[in-house]
Amino acid sequence: MSKLIIMKLGGSAISDKSRPLSYREDWVRKLGTLLNREFRSGSRFILIHGGGSFAHPIALAYGLSRYRDYDQLIGVSLTSAVLNYLSMKITLTLASIGLSIYPLRTGSIYVIKDGKPHLLIGPTHLMELIERNTIPMLYGDVVISDDGFSIISGDDIMLDLGSRLRPSASIFLTDVPGILDANGNIIRRLTRSSVINERDVHHIDVTGGS
């Protein structure tokens, strides 16, 4: 089989988080040009994108990092809608330069069960889409969970699909040059001692990812 690459488009790369509903079309278009070249050379992709400035303001306003009551359901609806809208914008941008993106609504194929992501379709379905020369694309989303609703981040999906599909590479695209330590220096090699404990992180992302 062709080389499979799972790639995450970080929310901070595809949007400006300081401006709600901002979309960096030029950045996505430039990335698409590179992907198109690699696709024509035989590489195959699964794309996953974050919520960026589309989902985060709503998720924060409605406290969707933890589902508690009925009043949050409007937030669930709005967050799901804007994420689908962002996915559509990315799809249209990439399709305009020749990439056959096949968007999948994450909330329709994933749930959170026992605190962990649970894929409702077999990974074979994703592979069949790839074999038909399309590029499946998922995104961080609000999904059904044991408690009602929870947010599954793009990072959660990357980890789950990476363990299921064993790609040749998993790539995370962000607006910073790499994984940074507490002083802002790039961590060239990850070890147990260099992994940041969440207790030491002062700015936790409300959706669990970017």
Q: Which role fits each region the language model picked out?
A:
Residues 1-46:
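N-terminal glycine-/serine-/threonine-rich phosphate-binding loop
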Residues 6-10, 48-49, 104-105, 137-139, ...:
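Short beta-strand segments
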Residues 13-15, 52-56, 109-112, 143-145, ...:
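Short, active-site-adjacent cap segments at secondary-structure transitions
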Residues 27, 31, 77-91, 149-151, ...:
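Polyanion-binding loop/helix "lid" in catalytic or ligand-binding cores
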Residues 29, 117-128, 144, 150-161:
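Active-site glycine-rich loop that binds ribose-phosphate moieties when present
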Residues 57-68, 185-196:
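Short, flexible, mixed-charge acidic loops at enzyme active sites
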Residues 61-141:
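Ligand-binding beta-strand-loop-alpha-helix segment within the catalytic cores
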Residues 163-189:
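Acidic, metal-binding active-site segment of PIN/NYN-like and related structure-specific nucleases
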